[in-house]
């Protein structure tokens, strides 16, 4: 299911680094993580939905690139975000 406007605003408010922040790597990664989790649940029921699976793989790649950027720019923000989101790395 798609991300509702309320869910999106809640995620933005939680991970924003300052007021009005919607584009920081933290916010983008958090939004992608929620979309990835939702799509993963969808694919558990619809195993043959290969178009959505491709979208999932693209989102995972985008998130990985953003995390690599954040790690390169500010390792402390990276570690904090990984811990807050509960990601493996």
Swiss-Prot record:
<keyword id="KW-0699">rRNA-binding</keyword>
<dbReference type="GO" id="GO:0019843">
    <property type="term" value="F:rRNA binding"/>
</dbReference>
<keyword id="KW-0687">Ribonucleoprotein</keyword>
<comment type="function">
    <text>One of the primary rRNA binding proteins, it binds directly to 16S rRNA where it helps nucleate assembly of the platform of the 30S subunit by binding and bridging several RNA helices of the 16S rRNA.</text>
</comment>
<dbReference type="Pfam" id="PF00312">
    <property type="entry name" value="Ribosomal_S15"/>
</dbReference>
<dbReference type="InterPro" id="IPR000589">
    <property type="entry name" value="Ribosomal_uS15"/>
</dbReference>
<dbReference type="GO" id="GO:0022627">
    <property type="term" value="C:cytosolic small ribosomal subunit"/>
</dbReference>
<comment type="similarity">
    <text>Belongs to the universal ribosomal protein uS15 family.</text>
</comment>
<comment type="subunit">
    <text>Part of the 30S ribosomal subunit. Forms a bridge to the 50S subunit in the 70S ribosome, contacting the 23S rRNA.</text>
</comment>
<dbReference type="GO" id="GO:0006412">
    <property type="term" value="P:translation"/>
</dbReference>
<comment type="function">
    <text>Forms an intersubunit bridge (bridge B4) with the 23S rRNA of the 50S subunit in the ribosome.</text>
</comment>
<dbReference type="InterPro" id="IPR005290">
    <property type="entry name" value="Ribosomal_uS15_bac-type"/>
</dbReference>
<keyword id="KW-0694">RNA-binding</keyword>
<dbReference type="GO" id="GO:0003735">
    <property type="term" value="F:structural constituent of ribosome"/>
</dbReference>
<keyword id="KW-0689">Ribosomal protein</keyword>
<protein>
    <recommendedName>
        <fullName>Small ribosomal subunit protein uS15</fullName>
    </recommendedName>
</protein>
<dbReference type="InterPro" id="IPR009068">
    <property type="entry name" value="uS15_NS1_RNA-bd_sf"/>
</dbReference>
């Amino acid at each position: 299911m798609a991300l509702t406007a309320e869910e999106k605003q809640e995620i933005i408010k939680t991970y924003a680094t300052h007021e009005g922040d919607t584009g920081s790597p933290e916010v983008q990664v958090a939004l992608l993580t929620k979309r990835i989790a939702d799509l993963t649940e969808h694919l558990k029921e619809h195993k043959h939905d290969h178009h959505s699976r491709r979208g999932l793989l693209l989102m995972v790649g985008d998130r990985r690139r953003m995390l690599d950027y954040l790690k390169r720019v500010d390792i402390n923000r990276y570690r904090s975000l990984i811990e807050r989101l509960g990601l493996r790395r």
